[in-house]
A protein has these predicted regions:
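Sec-dependent signal peptide recognition
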Residues: 1-7
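Residue-level signal for functionally critical sites in structured catalytic/ligand-binding pockets
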Residues: 3, 107, 119-121
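Positively charged, low-complexity intrinsically disordered regions
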Residues: 3, 16, 81-84
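Tryptophan-anchored aromatic micro-motifs
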Residues: 9, 13-40, 115-119
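Contiguous, well-ordered beta-strand patches that form the walls/edges
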Residues: 32-38, 48-105, 115
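Periodic aromatic/glycine/histidine/acidic cluster detector
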Residues: 42-44
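Acidic/polar residues at beta-strand termini and the immediately following turn/coil
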Residues: 111-113
Length: 121
């Protein structure tokens, strides 16, 4: 019985993400937190170099970045693994212990390397 409960509980938890991809430039989609993480085709340029990340406006971006031009920096920081197992864009080592992250919380941005998404509000 205890084994069965452990198995059921483990499937309900969000699984930790894979490791950071190699240095390079990638195109990710925006996952909108206020719409349950749905993507709407809005692209972001993701530049990774030695644990540092820079997000830039893609030329294929929608109206999300009103007033921003293609190539403008949206956000940058250090990649850190949050205590929950997800990767965050952080500028403070203490961010890994924050209760609220990502989306519309005002906390660090969540990046999902497996789904190739950036969670934003």
């Amino acid at each position: 019985m205890q084994l069965l409960l452990s198995l059921l509980f483990s499937f309900t938890l969000e699984q930790p993400q894979s490791e950071i991809p190699k240095n390079g430039t990638y195109i990710y989609e925006v996952a909108f937190a206020e719409w349950s993480g749905r993507t709407m085709g809005d692209e972001v340029i993701v530049m990774l170099k030695d644990g540092h990340i820079t997000l830039k406006v893609s030329k294929n971006s929608n109206i999300l970045w009103m007033g921003a031009a293609s190539g403008d920096v949206i956000e940058e920081g250090t990649l850190r693994k949050h205590q929950s197992g997800v990767w965050i864009i952080s500028n403070d080592e203490k961010d890994v212990s924050l209760e609220e992250i990502g989306g519309c919380t005002g906390g660090p941005t969540v990046i999902d390397f497996d789904k190739q998404t950036i969670e934003m509000c």
